[in-house]
């Protein structure tokens, strides 16, 4: 039986940099400076027990609001049958959209959760700087053979043309080898510089910068912003505008996008008193690519589902799996030739009220235990008009997000 957790929390008058809190071995989930970071592990558990653990957290004093003071960082793997896993940190810093900041100490012994220790922890996080990164050499190699990937794309395209499925997402993986352990702190800083408006995360050696909001719950209000349909960005404004216009006009990409939006909308609607969505997709830009995106917002009926329940219902969306879900997933298992692990699942956080924010686990890497290897993933939606070598080029563009952050002298 796990001992009950306790928490001591205080507002921060001087904000802390969430990257500095995470450093290279902590926990991070942040977008545009808003999010959570943590250090240590007060408890690790799966989705079958996490809500009970959060609901039983006790405040050490009347200045601490336990349901708001503790969050669990979570990863939901791609495989639907695989449970999400969670970590509640010993030290948590929360930067909210309203500008408020707080720091919490979490543990099983309330006598150790004092205001004096909290002040010492804040001082340590504010003053400690990670060691400068070492000089590394790198090699990059495919894990999924290119021919295997191209064959899988053709198999998925043929299945769509036969009418077996509407869409399937086919992915591949590559590996980066480093002569020295990778410096996670520096990688996260590079991701912030290039992808600050993406959801940047690090949980147990799984890190990335996802541009796609799977679901966010704040009380009864929920939001989602699915992305599907991709074009490159060159840095030339004229060229990028032309590519964006071609993306919007592309029947292939509009079909791919519509499949995703319809699934997310139809999944959420029965649980909402209303659910609004943009009538037409818009362009969502990140550093090196641009996507078709459609924002949805609604209000949950009472009693509202938790963020975790919403994640379980939506994950994986057709943006990473396909449609119909079971048929597409069966095809992926048959032809893709790899175990995706956490790629294509979801990553985020949940609190004791059931609120949380979760991103689709893309533009990501899984580090080896010794941090000398990083496994990177990229994929694309396959429909009837998909061309295998164009899909291959799209995955290469998507790999660049993590490659440019990892492979540095």
Placement of each model-derived feature along the sequence:
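An anion-binding catalytic pocket shared by soluble metabolic enzymes
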Residues: 31-34, 38-45, 80-91, 172-255, ...
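A residue-level signal for conserved active-site and pocket-lining positions in enzyme catalytic cores
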Residues: 74, 93, 163, 215, ...
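Contiguous alpha-helical scaffold segments within structured protein domains
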Residues: 1-12, 32-45, 110, 116-154, ...
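Conserved hydrophobic core element of enzyme catalytic domains
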Residues: 295-409
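Extreme N-terminus nucleophile/cap motif
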Residues: 1-60, 164-165, 177-190, 194-196, ...
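Short coil/turn segments at secondary-structure boundaries
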Residues: 31, 166-171, 201-204, 280, ...
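A short glycine-rich, hydrophobically flanked beta-strand micro-motif that places a catalytic Asp/Glu
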Residues: 25-26, 71-76, 199-204, 340-348
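Non-catalytic accessory segments adjacent to catalytic cores
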Residues: 52-176, 271-274, 407
């Amino acid at each position: 039986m796990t001992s009950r957790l306790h928490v001591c929390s205080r507002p921060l008058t001087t904000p802390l940099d969430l990257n500095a809190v995470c450093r290279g071995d902590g926990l991070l989930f942040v977008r545009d400076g808003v999010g959570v970071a943590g250090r240590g592990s007060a408890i690790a558990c799966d989705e079958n027990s996490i809500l009970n653990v959060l609901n039983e957290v006790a405040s050490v004093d009347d200045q601490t609001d336990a349901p708001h003071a503790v969050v669990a960082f979570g990863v939901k793997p791609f495989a639907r049958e695989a449970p999400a896993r969670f970590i509640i940190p010993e030290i948590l810093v929360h930067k909210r959209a309203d500008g408020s900041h707080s720091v919490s100490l979490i543990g099983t012994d309330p006598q150790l959760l004092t205001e004096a220790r909290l002040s010492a922890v804040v001082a340590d996080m504010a003053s400690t700087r990670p060691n400068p990164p070492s000089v590394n050499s790198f090699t990059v190699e495919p894990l999924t053979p290119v021919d295997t990937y191209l064959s899988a794309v053709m198999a998925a395209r043929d299945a769509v043309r036969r009418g077996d499925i509407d869409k399937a997402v086919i992915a591949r993986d590559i590996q980066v080898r480093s002569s020295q352990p990778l410096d996670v702190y520096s990688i996260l800083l590079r991701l912030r510089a290039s992808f600050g408006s993406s959801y940047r995360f690090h949980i147990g050696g799984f890190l990335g910068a996802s541009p796609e909001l799977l679901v966010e719950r704040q009380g009864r209000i929920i939001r989602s912003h699915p992305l599907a349909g991709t074009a490159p960005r060159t840095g030339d404004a004229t060229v990028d505008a032309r590519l964006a216009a071609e993306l919007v006009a592309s029947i292939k990409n509009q079909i791919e996008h519509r499949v995703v939006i319809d699934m997310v909308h139809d999944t959420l609607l029965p649980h909402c008193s209303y659910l609004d969505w943009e009538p037409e997709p818009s362009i969502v830009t990140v550093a090196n690519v641009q996507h078709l995106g459609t924002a949805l917002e609604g209000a949950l009926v009472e009693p509202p589902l938790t963020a975790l329940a919403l994640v379980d219902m939506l994950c994986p969306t057709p943006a990473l799996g396909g449609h119909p879900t079971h048929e597409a997933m069966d095809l992926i298992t048959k032809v893709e030739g790899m175990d995706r692990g956490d790629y294509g699942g979801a990553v985020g956080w949940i609190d004791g009220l059931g609120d949380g924010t979760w991103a689709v686990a893309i533009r990501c890497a899984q580090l080896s235990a010794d941090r000398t290897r990083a496994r990177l993933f990229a994929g694309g939606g396959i429909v009837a008009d998909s061309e295998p070598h164009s899909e291959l080029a799209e995955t290469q563009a998507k790999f660049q997000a993590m490659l440019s952050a990892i492979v540095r002298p």
